[in-house]
Amino acid sequence: MIDKKITFVFGSGRKDKIEAEKNYAKEFFYSYFDLKKKYVDTNLIEFNDNNRNRLLINIDRLLRKLSGLSFFTNSIIKGENYKILKNSDIVIATNDRIGLSVLPMIRLIKLKKQMKFCVIVMGLFSNRPKNKSRLKLQNSFLRTLLKTADEFIFLGKPELMEASDKYPAFKEKFTFIPFSIDETFWKDQVNDFSDREGILFIGNDSHRDYKFSIDLANKMPNVNFTFITSQIREIDLISENVSFIEGKWNNQTLSDENLREIYNNSKLVIVPLKNSLQPSGQSVTLQSMAMGTPVLITMTDGFWDIENYKNNENIFFLNENTLNEWVEKIESIYYDSNKLKKISESGKSTIMKEYKIENFTNNLEKLISK
């Protein structure tokens, strides 16, 4: 066992998932369980969205408004969490919102002791305000984070390149580690595409093109669609060919096992995206490919790892969200079981080679042991 103390800082929902003692996918724990087996002391703390520190709430709102950055210090700053962080040798903030929110505590701790502070990046450098005053303030906060953190783990290559270009003095801190999924959990059971049916849309982030997805389902009344999201109201889905499940990862309205079954029974997963440098749609794409369900996704500037994806070989790409183009593409592949089977097998092979959770763990271990 390695004699160091690691603390992972998560958004809400991880403790509930662990305590439920159900079978679930492990990728959104970012190798917490693997490192727990190797390090003497591995802790986790998480956001508590029920915290009601009025002062911090008001400060967060002001900082978000002025900088365009996601500060939620109210959800994480408290004495108990500070003590855990202070006793840690390595702290891993599992997204940039968390990194910004724990920043005041980390800076205070680093005045008194050495520790390694790592931040996983998912869009931190992709939201640049047009207002000069906001941009100046945002840069000030980003530079503070860049100086304080020891390592930045990018889940998308384009955002890493953008950050390296804008902040070259800190690029030695930047590392690309591909997001990887729990391939032991996401395993398909239905191999015959004649037994699969329907198109699945799933996701909640701000870069999904929800309106386009609804319009697409309305445009194809002869194909069944399933929407799993908390960002669309059921009343907006007026077509009879659409099923709706309100779902979000951290509220457990839909278990991972339920979701796996839906993937397994779907013929195609669609991921229409708005253009951004953020690697949006990543987890859904990888989960779907691991399940052998082909993915049709919008090619964006932030697509995370283009070298490992080939259009019409292990994935389907479209460059724009235009209804006629998407309808034409879906109609050309949806009824072609041989084509779907080929993409399915190639997609699963890509996951097993490049995006197993073991790969993420190995890369993370190398980084934190530097």
Q: Where in this protein do the model-derived segments appear?
A:
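Membrane-proximal helix-turn-helix segments that form the acceptor-binding/catalytic region
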Residues: 33, 79-87, 132-152
